From Swiss-Prot:
Reactions performed catalytically: ATP + H2O + a folded polypeptide = ADP + phosphate + an unfolded polypeptide
Entry keyword set: ATP-binding, Chaperone, Cytoplasm, Isomerase, Nucleotide-binding
Taxonomic classification: Bacteria, Bacillati, Bacillota, Bacilli, Bacillales
Protein known as: Chaperonin GroEL
Quaternary structure note: Forms a cylinder of 14 subunits composed of two heptameric rings stacked back-to-back. Interacts with the co-chaperonin GroES.
GO biological process annotation, one example: protein refolding
Record-linked NCBIfam families: GroEL, PRK00013.1, PRK12849.1, PRK12850.1, PRK12851.1
Length: 543
């Protein structure tokens, strides 16, 4: 396909229209008085959202050059979301401001490579200032503040804070859609995996349809058990102890399953069989996790262990086990703390080393089950449209909260970026590098200007006032007052603010140093050929 190429001033100018279009759609959502954006869906109801990464994903422009500009800014939002999970709107607004200011200076004859160096120095100083302003998150109320600001909902803030308190920072918190109207929190204590009982005859509580085992022994193996003779020796030892038994195996079937069920129905002893969780190597790792948690051994031929010669000492123990049709929950595992901590450290190292997002997610789940727990926020709403919008907000708030726990909190509402201006002004540069510093200085004001504009106020007046105020004093657009942002609970995660600024500057610098743009030449749609006159057939000629 033929290409068209644009050089020098034409190249960035044609992309600038796309750079402006995308932020214009996103920036209206910024701040407490930000608006929503409606996204068309080919199937189902439209999506109403104020999420700064969902909106850019939907934008594709017809003109190839404009679309390239829009996609560059989209990358800022996506990268910021990937690192910090929030701050996408701020990052988009910052990137557009830097590109706009930068192009003015490049058009006036400034050298883009020198401007870039100045921008990098300025952003470096601003990032260090953000880190120095950051305060660690020390209590539940601070976590609730971060989540409430991100979700624009105090109730959601409290739910996320409660979830984090219960499962710890290593715990997994997931967001699911509820069937009701109320948003609620469900916490699973202990280790839970998604495998249920092998036979419904094993249940002990017919009302709840679950098997509850108190203080049981746990046989853990990666083998398939079909012959009862294989496990008879260990079964006899368990029966003599008078305790119930949980068998976790690749599968329990045939004669072995029938014998367990018959003995349960006769009341001889209680044994529940469940399939091992996961598949392949992940299954082996999860069985080792269960063994560490319960203080047992995985009976596997790889270690030279045989089911027939298994002793009671090799079985795991737990305070309580609840088995439903779909899940098994191990509560109060009797494993040695040092072994569990060693296992946790090993999984943490694997999380750091892996390059696969899928593997990282699965490792994070295993870590949570060993070290923390699992909490589920079930989102309720009156309509499907509201449910989707609410779920997106809660996911953003959750990401922002995790980032806050990691690197601390800073004053919100764009205040920290204004506070960083003094540090940037102190950067020593020569020649045209000063232009790069000026571009960053001007863009640091942009989020506050936009928050004010969305509230129907004049941003310049507020920016000038904030520059004179002490660090931490900001503008609360919801009440239109100047307040101590930390005391008022208007906070952002330091990681979110830092990532937004760094990613915006990175893409802006790349944009400004672009000298040529290549795009596919649009195809001309040829008019469809008309039908020929069908002469010879009386009355059938075309009029």
């Amino acid at each position: 396909m033929a290409k068209q190429v644009k050089f020098s001033e034409d190249a960035p100018r044609s992309m600038l229209r796309g750079v402006e279009t995308l932020p214009n759609a996103v920036k209206v959502t910024l701040g407490p008085k930000g608006r929503n954006v409606v996204l068309e869906k080919k199937f189902g109801s439209p999506l109403i959202t104020n999420d700064g990464v969902t909106i850019p994903k939907e934008i594709e422009l017809e003109d190839a050059y404009e679309n390239m500009g829009a996609q560059l800014v989209k990358e800022v939002a996506t990268k910021t979301n990937g690192i910090a999970g929030d701050g996408t709107t701020t990052a988009t607004v910052l990137a557009a401001a830097m590109i706009r200011e930068g192009l003015k200076n490049v058009a006036a004859g400034a050298n883009p490579m020198v401007i870039r160096r100045g921008m990098e120095k300025a952003v470096g100083a601003a990032v260090e200032e953000i880190k120095s302003i950051a305060k660690p998150v020390e209590n539940k109320s601070s976590i609730a503040q971060v989540a409430a600001i991100s979700a624009d909902d105090q109730e959601v803030g409290n739910l996320i804070a409660e979830a984090m308190e219960k499962v710890g920072k290593d715990g997994v918190i997931t967001v699911e859609e509820s069937k009701g109207f109320v948003t609620e929190l469900e916490v699973v204590e202990g280790m839970q995996f998604d495998r249920g009982y092998a036979s419904p005859y094993m249940i002990t509580d017919t009302d709840k349809m679950e098997a509850v085992l108190n203080n049981p022994f746990i046989l853990i193996t990666d083998k398939k058990i079909s012959n009862i003779q294989e496990v008879l020796p260990v079964l006899e030892q368990v029966v003599q102890s008078g305790k119930p038994l949980l068998i976790i195996a690749e599968d329990v079937e045939g004669e072995a399953l029938a014998t367990l069920v018959v003995n349960k129905l006769r009341g001889t002893f209680t044994a529940v069989a469940v399939k091992a969780p996961g598949f392949g190597d992940r299954r082996k790792a999860m069985l080792q996790d269960i063994a560490a948690l319960t203080g047992g051994e995985v009976i596997t031929e790889e270690l030279g262990l045989d089911l027939k010669s298994t002793k009671l000492e090799q079985l795991g123990r737990a305070g309580k086990i609840v088995v439903t049709k779909e899940n098994t929950t191990v509560v109060e595992g009797a494993g040695d703390k040092a072994n569990i901590e060693s296992r946790v450290a090993q999984i943490r190292q694997q999380i750091e080393d892996t390059t696969s997002d899928f593997d990282r997610e699965k490792l994070q789940e295993r870590l949570a089950k060993l070290a923390g727990g699992v909490a589920v926020i079930k989102v309720g709403a009156a309509t499907e449209t509201e449910l989707k919008e609410k779920k997106l907000r809660i996911e953003d708030a959750l990401n922002s909260t995790r980032a806050a726990v990691e690197e601390g909190i800073v004053p919100g509402g764009g205040t920290t970026l204004i506070n960083a201006i003094k540090a940037v002004e102190g950067v020593k540069v020569e020649g045209e590098e000063a232009v790069g510093v000026h571009i960053v200085l001007r863009s640091l004001e942009e989020p506050v200007r936009q928050i004010a504009a969305n509230a129907g106020l004049e941003g310049s007046v507020i920016v000038e006032r904030l520059k004179k105020e002490p660090v931490g004093i900001g503008f609360n657009a919801a009440t239109e007052e100047y307040v101590n942002m930390l005391e008022a609970g208007i906070v952002d995660a330091a990681k979110v603010t830092r990532s937004a600024l760094s990613n915006a500057a990175s893409v802006a610098a790349m944009f400004l140093t672009t000298e040529a743009v290549i795009a596919d030449k649009p195809e001309e749609n040829k008019a469809p050929m008309g039908m020929p006159d069908m002469g010879g057939m009386g009355g059938m000629g075309m009029m």
